[in-house]
Amino acid sequence: MNDEDQDDKTKELPLGKETEANLFKSRSIFIYGPINQELAQKVCSQLVALAAASDEDIRIYVNSPGGHVESGDSIHDMIKFIKPKVWMIGTGWVASAGALIYVATPKERRLCLPNTRFLLHQPSGGTRGMASDIEIQAREIIKMNERLNRIMAAATGQPLDKIDKDTDRDYWLSAEEAKDYGLVSRIVTSQADI
């Protein structure tokens, strides 16, 4: 490795730390990418740290294809658990377990950018093994689906039977459709709108 390569690597590290410090100061968290245990641990730690630092509002930007439901549950529950108010800003796509996290705040604090797309659907699982184990997993997925649909119905104001029907297959919504559906309170185009 030559000196120029070393200088480039050295320059990258402080920028990352500086960005993290600025995000902490601005009380902003980014949930970008798949929802998994590692992301849940990071986001929950950030939420607890921000709550310990101050009661000021927190902003969470969500752009996720979804992922592990239980990891989404832990973020969803932690958002409700901490004292500061949390604002959700959807961007890109807010799908599946990402939508579960997104609805952790009251509707009036759920915003999105104009080109955000939302995806609601039933959870899926891949299991194999003995028939009795597959049956157990199927029952658990059905219970999870019922629980998630109750959460989504409460968050949107839609009747549970409509949520059941809509999430039976992939249900895509534009930002405007998500607003009409009750997922989003406002579509924003700048930080000044928040």
Curated annotation (Swiss-Prot):
Active site residues of this protein: S96, H121
GO (cellular component) term, any one: cytoplasm
Catalytic activity: Hydrolysis of proteins to small peptides in the presence of ATP and magnesium. alpha-casein is the usual test substrate. In the absence of ATP, only oligopeptides shorter than five residues are hydrolyzed (such as succinyl-Leu-Tyr-|-NHMec, and Leu-Tyr-Leu-|-Tyr-Trp, in which cleavage of the -Tyr-|-Leu- and -Tyr-|-Trp bonds also occurs)
Pfam families to which the protein is assigned, alphabetical: CLP_protease
One GO BP annotation of this record: protein quality control for misfolded or incompletely synthesized proteins
Chief location category: cytoplasm
EC number: 3.4.21.92
Quaternary structure and interacting proteins, as annotated: Fourteen ClpP subunits assemble into 2 heptameric rings which stack back to back to give a disk-like structure with a central cavity, resembling the structure of eukaryotic proteasomes.
Function per UniProt: Cleaves peptides in various proteins in a process that requires ATP hydrolysis. Has a chymotrypsin-like activity. Plays a major role in the degradation of misfolded proteins.
Name of the featured protein: ATP-dependent Clp protease proteolytic subunit 3
